[in-house]
A protein has these predicted regions:
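Bacterial Sec-dependent N-terminal signal peptides
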Residues: 1-30, 426
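Proteolytic processing hotspots in large secreted/extracellular or virion-associated proteins
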Residues: 27, 347-383
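N-terminal exported-region signature
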Residues: 34-62, 66-68, 72-73, 77-297, ...
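Hydrophobic beta-strand segments within beta-rich accessory/binding domains
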Residues: 149, 287, 370-379, 445-448
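Edge strands and adjacent loops of beta-rich recognition modules
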Residues: 258, 328-360
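C-terminal outer-membrane/trafficking sorting elements
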Residues: 359, 364-367, 433-505
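Extracellular Ig-like/FN3 beta-sandwich strand-entry sites
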Residues: 370, 414-416, 484-486
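Short, compositionally biased serine/threonine- and acidic-rich segments at solvent-exposed termini, linkers
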Residues: 396-428
Length: 505
């Protein structure tokens, strides 16, 4: 496990002395709930009007309490059968001990608890209803040690029952398990796909596991592109950090968003992720309440997002070109109808590709549905002096620093190596080369004057823009059955896009 800092014996002594001194001088405060509003923030609810203000304050609760502000204390003791609720988005830190018995200890949606020992809790996750004829998926995770079986009591099963869906991903077979067909319990450390036609609040009741946890990954080579696909969830009752790149599910659309390890972004409680194992020996991952490390000399990345042109704000897919070491993340397509933007390295498709420096970077793109798409390209955390997008099909050369959005028509027949990102103005990309590379004779198009080892693809279209032929340049092309007329040849290499007209008689 990677450590965020090193603690030497001398530091241990210093820390111990500090803790002893702080605890010795800590004040005891009692929550009486005098006003009846139950609010922690209201000083009138505290004995003598004294709210706890120190990180080692000893707090006794003598009435039901609502934590409506961020709190950092030493101990928390329930003096009766009282309840505690941490409101949505608020944080409760208890540095030493909690004595709460079996009484309700509730964390509302995205509330956080930082406490290193096990504690019996109820943790809530708010679910927004999906619209008619569509599913707004949620990638959810259980933050308690015990298995949670979906029921009407914990909000998973609603009325009418048919309007919710819950799936578990089986890493062994790369297949989905439908809860309605094969019921299952939610396990700590795993993530699940959930949607509901009604607004609902899921409740996870059980015992917390502290502030860090290890989760195990699996790898099954026989599953092809999904060999290392693992649905892993935040197992902690607080925002947590992972020690690798991962995917989250967009809150606005059914798309998965790649998050680079170097960004040190946190994952909300009750939220799932998708991870990729690189092989049989890559079999564990760590979650922690604090970052595992901070990148020195962070270099940023270029983000590429794709959306349908009719709704450019609704991101359908995304890829990152990272300039930080160790951010690589294998490409996973979760939804069959989504477009796919990605990089390829050593025959492996990547959602995040780490590079030291680059002059030109091929960018691949595929669609499952013909239509108009908008690609948005934006450097983040990095000053870029020159960045152009080259469309290998149309020959367009776009300065994305001036025009970050590029709208284009895509077909399922287009070759995947459609785009290039160019970072050097003198790279020498020629949109059209005058030198002919092909000729037609007796029903055959002959390709010559080409270094075929550098060729990405050959595409031939008719004057109506229909793709007649597409493939790698491996020889000559037969025109048997083609309609006589003018055809456009587009030859894409790693450095050029060459175009030529040919008349077939």
């Amino acid at each position: 496990m990677e450590k965020s800092r090193f603690i030497t014996p001398n530091r241990i002594v210093i820390i111990a002395l500090f803790l002893f001194s702080a605890m010795a001088s800590a004040h005891a405060q009692t929550f009486l709930g005098t006003t009846g509003d139950k609010l922690w923030s209201n000083a009138d609810n505290w004995l003598g009007g004294l709210k706890p203000t120190e990180m080692f304050s000893e707090v006794t609760v003598s009435a039901d309490v609502i934590v409506d502000e961020d709190v950092n204390i030493g101990t928390l003791n329930n003096a009766g059968n009282h309840t505690l609720t941490v409101l949505a988005g608020k944080t409760l830190i208890v540095n030493v001990a909690i004595d709460w018995g079996d009484n309700d200890f509730i964390l509302e949606d995205k509330a956080e608890l930082f406490y290193s020992n096990p504690l019996k809790v109820g943790i809530k996750k708010a679910i927004k209803a999906f619209e008619e004829d569509s599913h707004l998926w949620n990638l959810i995770a259980s933050p308690v040690r015990e298995d949670v079986f979906p029921s009407t009591e914990n909000g998973f099963i609603t009325d009418p029952e048919t309007r919710y869906v819950l799936y578990s991903f089986n890493e062994n077979t790369a297949g989905w398990i439908n809860f309605k067909e094969t019921p299952f319990a939610l396990e700590n450390g795993k993530s699940y796909m959930y949607a509901n036609a009604l607004d609902t609040t899921l409740i996870f009741e059980g015992t917390t596991i502290g502030n860090q946890a290890e989760c195990h990954l699996s790898y099954h080579a026989e599953n092809g592109a999904y060999a290392g696909c693992n649905f892993i969830g935040n197992p902690l009752p607080c925002y947590a950090f992972l020690n690798r790149s991962y995917y989250i599910l967009s809150e606005e659309s059914n798309s998965i968003i790649a998050v680079a390890n170097s960004e040190t972004k946190s994952i909300a409680p009750c939220t799932g992720t998708i991870l990729n194992s690189e092989g049989p020996d890559d079999n564990d991952v760590w979650f922690s309440y604090m970052p595992f490390f901070q990148y020195l000399g962070y270099q940023g990345y270029v983000e590429i997002t794709v959306a349908k042109s009719e709704v450019p704000s609704l991101v359908l897919d995304q890829a990152l070109l990272s300039f930080n070491e160790g951010d690589d993340l294998a490409k996973i397509s979760l939804f069959d109808d989504a477009p796919k933007v990605y990089f390829t390295q050593n025959d492996k498709d990547l959602a995040i590709f780490s590079v030291d420096s680059v002059e030109v970077q091929p960018l691949r793109f595929k669609v499952k549905e013909n239509g108009s798409y908008t690609m948005h390209i934006e450097p983040k955390g990095r000053e870029v002096e020159y960045l152009h997008l080259i469309d290998n099909i149309t020959g367009s050369n776009v300065d994305v620093l001036v025009h970050p959005d590029y709208t284009f028509t895509a077909s399922t027949n287009d070759y995947s190596s459609r785009f290039k990102l160019v970072f050097k103005p003198d790279y020498g990309i020629e949109e059209f080369e005058n030198q002919n590379f092909a000729f037609y004779s007796n029903g055959t198009i002959y390709i010559n004057n080409v270094e075929t080892q550098n060729v990405a693809s050959l595409q031939i279209v008719d004057m109506k823009g229909r793709v007649i032929y597409q493939g790698d340049v491996s020889g000559n092309v037969s025109t048997n059955g083609w309609v006589p007329g003018v055809y456009i040849l587009r030859l894409v290499t790693d450095r050029t896009v060459r175009m030529q007209k040919i008349v077939i008689k």
